[in-house]
Amino acid sequence: MVQFVTIPNLTDYQVTLKLMQNYVNKVINVNEPEIVYLVEHSEVYTAGTNYKQEELLNYSDIPVIYTGRGGKFTFHGPGQRVIYPILNLASPNRSKDLKLYIKMLEEWIINSLNYFGIKAYLIKDKVGIWVKVRKDEFAKIAAIGIRVRKWVTYHGVAINISTDLSKFGGIIPCGLENSLVTSLNQLGVHIEMSEFDKIIQTEFNKIFT
């Protein structure tokens, strides 16, 4: 069974990035076991490899980090659960199939949200997990951006629990103009982060083990 490790308190993004990179090296070089890090970051905008500078609108005093993950700009901050699975897709019980891996990530998050009564969707040509907020109008509740090195995954998923959604106003999230963002709180679901963590671990084990 894959170990889940919760990093306490707000964590600097670059510190976590180094932690991930170091652990990926251990998985590749000395066959360390797979792990999933659960993190809550200090405020930061991160840019993936497909970012466009004009998608950074107004970030005031929030730092901007240019990362190696896929995707474009997103926001991380308090009240958001960020999940970093470090999995070895080359291991016998996995598959060297990135599309399948992303599909499994999506299914995992959708099932976890469903536990709390939130019906979530995938939208063609729009990365991430979405919920319907009005008739024919959707808002993103979770962002996905991954990277793989020698078939070992890192980076991952960010889910808005009680996030200050106004912070997304400093960017064009994931490069999608006029897209809405939402959170569990905004949808009327008020839970502790620890309660959410229990469910995502349960749902992870149903799909990845």
Curated annotation (Swiss-Prot):
Family: Belongs to the LipB family.
EC top class named in words: transferase
Name under which the protein is recorded: Octanoyltransferase
Gene Ontology cellular component list: cytoplasm
PANTHER family, A to Z: LIPOYLTRANSFERASE 2, MITOCHONDRIAL-RELATED, OCTANOYLTRANSFERASE
GO terms for biological process, alphabetical: protein modification process
Gene behind the chain: lipB
Entry keywords, A to Z: Acyltransferase, Cytoplasm, Transferase
Site (Lowers pKa of active site Cys): K140
Pathway: Protein modification; protein lipoylation via endogenous pathway; protein N(6)-(lipoyl)lysine from octanoyl-[acyl-carrier-protein]: step 1/2
Localization per record: Cytoplasm
Active-site positions on this chain: C174 (acyl-thioester intermediate)
GO MF terms, alphabetically ordered: lipoyl(octanoyl) transferase activity
UniProt-annotated binding residues for substrate: R69, G70, G71, K72, F73, T74, F75, H76, A143, I144, G145, G156, V157, A158
InterPro entries: aa-tRNA-synth_II/BPL/LPL, BPL_LPL_catalytic, Octanoyltransferase, Octanoyltransferase_CS
Function: Catalyzes the transfer of endogenously produced octanoic acid from octanoyl-acyl-carrier-protein onto the lipoyl domains of lipoate-dependent enzymes. Lipoyl-ACP can also act as a substrate although octanoyl-ACP is likely to be the physiological substrate.
Domain annotation BPL/LPL catalytic: ranges: 30-209
